[in-house]
């Protein structure tokens, strides 16, 4: 971070100003929770929407939103603008879907990043969709690609890139964008972790020619590095507990503080 690191992200709002959306975002119903417009959708609706509009969505981005990103947005106006500045913010976290239902949106269903990846990969050969993977580590990406090619025969992987963990220089960034655009992907899956991946997508809105989707742990799930919770835990909103047991050191502090803030501000104060 620091001053020197602001290069790539400083242009977020300039980039967005130049980006001209080809679809009407108002057609996507939303429920504002802690200032973030959470899309009132379910998986079937989203898949149909993507299939119908994918060529009009080049250069836009989708945020995969959960309690953590929503609480961070509530406390950080810049990040809130990033969450609200894309095509939509989908309810990856069950608490968001439950809160929206309590607020009078019964049709909303949890739509997780890994599930979305899986469904899009399933439909890709029929549509001829091309995929680009940006982020994570070389090891994770190699494992993930091997597994995807095995599980989804015919899946077109147009390209992959593992950026360094430091901020890129403007020159490096321009090269990264050129590589993505040369590959002509329909979907650009971004695995930099929140909030970094959402800021990256906003900074590249209109510059990257593909639909960017920030999937964080999605790369880890597909590489097999992180196992997903059993289905019964997913159904009972206990996936967070399963992940906590796998990575207690990193996640305990985050879950404890953000979950409490969410319950207090969203559930009790109805922000």
Predicted segments with their positions:
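N-terminal nucleotide/polyanion-binding subdomain common to many enzyme families
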Residues: 12, 16-115
């Amino acid at each position: 971070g620091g001053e020197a690191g602001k290069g790539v992200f400083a242009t977020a709002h300039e980039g967005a100003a130049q980006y001209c959306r080809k679809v009407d975002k108002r057609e996507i119903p939303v429920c504002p929770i802690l200032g973030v417009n959470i899309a009132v959708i379910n998986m079937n609706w989203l898949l149909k929407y993507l299939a119908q509009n994918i060529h009009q969505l080049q250069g836009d981005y989708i945020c995969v939103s959960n309690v953590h990103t929503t609480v961070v947005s509530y406390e950080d106006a810049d990040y809130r603008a990033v969450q609200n500045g894309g095509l939509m913010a989908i309810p990856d976290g069950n608490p968001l879907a439950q809160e929206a239902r309590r607020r009078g949106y019964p049709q909303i269903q949890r739509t997780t990043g890994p599930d979305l990846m899986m469904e899009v990969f399933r439909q890709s050969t029929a549509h001829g969709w091309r995929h680009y993977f940006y982020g994570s580590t070389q090891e994770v990406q190699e494992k993930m690609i091997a597994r995807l090619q095995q599980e989804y025969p015919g899946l077109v992987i147009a390209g992959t890139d593992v950026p360094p963990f430091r901020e890129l220089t403007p020159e490096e960034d321009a090269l990264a964008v050129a590589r993505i655009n040369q590959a002509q992907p329909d979907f650009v899956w971004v695995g930099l972790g929140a909030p970094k991946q959402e800021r990256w997508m906003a900074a590249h809105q209109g510059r990257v020619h593909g639909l960017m989707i920030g999937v964080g742990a999605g790369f880890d799930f597909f590489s097999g590095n992180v196992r997903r919770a059993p289905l019964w835990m997913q159904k009972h909103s206990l996936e967070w507990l399963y992940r906590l047991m796998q990575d207690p050191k990193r996640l305990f502090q985050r879950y404890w503080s953000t979950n409490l803030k969410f319950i207090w501000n969203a559930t009790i104060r109805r922000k």
